[in-house]
From Swiss-Prot:
Summary of activators and inhibitors of this protein: Activity is inhibited by phenylmethylsulfonyl fluoride (PMSF), but not by EDTA.
Protein name: Minor extracellular protease Vpr
Molecular functions (GO terms): serine-type endopeptidase activity
Domain annotation Inhibitor I9: ranges: 57-142
Domain PA: 383-461
Propeptide, chain numbering: 29-160
UniProt xrefs under PROSITE patterns: SUBTILASE (PS51892), SUBTILASE_ASP (PS00136), SUBTILASE_HIS (PS00137), SUBTILASE_SER (PS00138)
Amino acid sequence: MKKGIIRFLLVSFVLFFALSTGITGVQAAPASSKTSADLEKAEVFGDIDMTTSKKTTVIVELKEKSLAEAKEAGESQSKSKLKTARTKAKNKAIKAVKNGKVNREYEQVFSGFSMKLPANEIPKLLAVKDVKAVYPNVTYKTDNMKDKDVTISEDAVSPQMDDSAPYIGANDAWDLGYTGKGIKVAIIDTGVEYNHPDLKKNFGQYKGYDFVDNDYDPKETPTGDPRGEATDHGTHVAGTVAANGTIKGVAPDATLLAYRVLGPGGSGTTENVIAGVERAVQDGADVMNLSLGNSLNNPDWATSTALDWAMSEGVVAVTSNGNSGPNGWTVGSPGTSREAISVGATQLPLNEYAVTFGSYSSAKVMGYNKEDDVKALNNKEVELVEAGIGEAKDFEGKDLTGKVAVVKRGSIAFVDKADNAKKAGAIGMVVYNNLSGEIEANVPGMSVPTIKLSLEDGEKLVSALKAGETKTTFKLTVSKALGEQVADFSSRGPVMDTWMIKPDISAPGVNIVSTIPTHDPDHPYGYGSKQGTSMASPHIAGAVAVIKQAKPKWSVEQIKAAIMNTAVTLKDSDGEVYPHNAQGAGSARIMNAIKADSLVSPGSYSYGTFLKENGNETKNETFTIENQSSIRKSYTLEYSFNGSGISTSGTSRVVIPAHQTGKATAKVKVNTKKTKAGTYEGTVIVREGGKTVAKVPTLLIVKEPDYPRVTSVSVSEGSVQGTYQIETYLPAGAEELAFLVYDSNLDFAGQAGIYKNQDKGYQYFDWDGTINGGTKLPAGEYYLLAYAANKGKSSQVLTEEPFTVE
């Protein structure tokens, strides 16, 4: 809903204002100019606003290598030596800045500390000789679609709901005795309700650590916490990995460790996320799952590099890819990690239904949870009951038992309307648009079968109900059998700067039923359905635990290669193969990975960018093929790329003795004069004995890719009461930048400011809360939209949460 309405209003705005250079109540925070001395200073990530005296927390990376980095480089490093160097750097930093305080310290996968200080003191911190880089302490959130969460009572949980683990092959692995036994999986999340009956077996005496409250009790945020909303996300993730009760996770005998890094409301910051990763490595975790992220598409962000070094320490790091799809370039940190396994979300196979009833030609099925519910509604005369906009109060005093609710779009999410209808006893719902035309959205997993109508048909239906025509019969037929589909919300790559394909792999992430705390003292433990890449990632973390038990000698690189090499290629509803940056290598299959005796790495590869002005340009990549079998094998290789002006060649045959490795070089030549600017995909196919053993996705980009012109925007309180600071991220700068204000109903309120020729990176603007040349915004909640245009392309992004004007 947000995207459609905002897009319409934005077009109107651009046509009307033509992006002139006038500004209203927004003033750019002055940028500090660089001098030759700056070249000797530490690098700043995120273009932090260093003009305000307001205190902020930053992550400080030191030149002294972390334990993991030194080990990888073959250098001698010890905790005592590193601690001495860190203490020396801390003392220098505290002496250099005013009112600075060190918070957390890091040594295992990141060398440095977090520090709170006035922002205008950061330049002095950068000048400290031992400091390598400074990062802002950005916010991380759970990667689930909160508006689609559904709580399920224990007696309603059935084996039919527990489909996703068997679908990726967990049951077959269990039959062979591979259940994740002996493997430690770290859940770095909102905490875990480890007393849940389905999770008790997975925890030992040591549960993990709580970095929010700084104690050894990493439970979820409870109801009534004055700091914010109760959480259940980490418990759901833990159940998907390893529940062992009514619900069975992918690796039911794995040992779990919980690290609470996200607090009330499912929100946390960089300093705690890095601390959680550090502690998991130090505690001996074999696998770690991070179902969290932000909108920063940057491979060198502190959390992303922390996962890179965790992988180098032999811990398989699995992370969600984000929920900002379906557009490209939407993957965020830590999904941008070079080494970790980033996971996209899919929806399990289902039947798509067509519906007819009455004379309502716009009728379409929006979504459903169980196919049996759809069949129960088919060819059955039912009574329709009008229920306003579907809020809980609209059902008060109405008998919906065995009936179908008719509601109007607006105010609350479709899933909430369906949940309210179900609670009132309804067996179905009809929702009609609140704008002219049809509803575009389809929402899988609606708690009751839901049929959508256009505004015109909806008003016609309501008129009929008022006239006493309340009975109808729905005729539902299967229109298409859909295979496993990539979820629209699943974020896409590539990663900026590295141009890497992301996600690496995909797994089920829609309508996943798992364990949750109910926060109800009488019935504290329950089950819930959630969706998001947060739900996909623990499927892979569990799969890794199972594979690691089956293949205890495999390295993190071998496990990653096995999962990617043996994945199933996914096709969309039209039978077209999904792009690499939508599905990665495909959908994971546990048994395929366990049975693999040939491994190809890397599991995907990007050749990077080819500049238009360079004409003919050639790049090579060497792939490693590992023969894990006890016999000599002969491998053949095929190379392909879409797009004219691109040719491929390389090693066509490699013979590898038993338990040995071989090399194959893949070459791509691009005539950029014949190839249009854009992103192009290829594949390296490796066969042995006529059987495909690996399909390796490849990628290249000609000239300037169609990256988003703006990726994030937020509003916070300004240094003066009643003012605000706007923060936005421009990946390559912007020729035109506008800030537009929308009220809580997403109706356009006015323009906050318009700019031209902005630099790349983080930009900060002081705003006095006025619109359209000085009009003060009335008290209430608002959203801010950032619109940026550069080199003929434009993008827009809306604040994730509303801000309050008092």
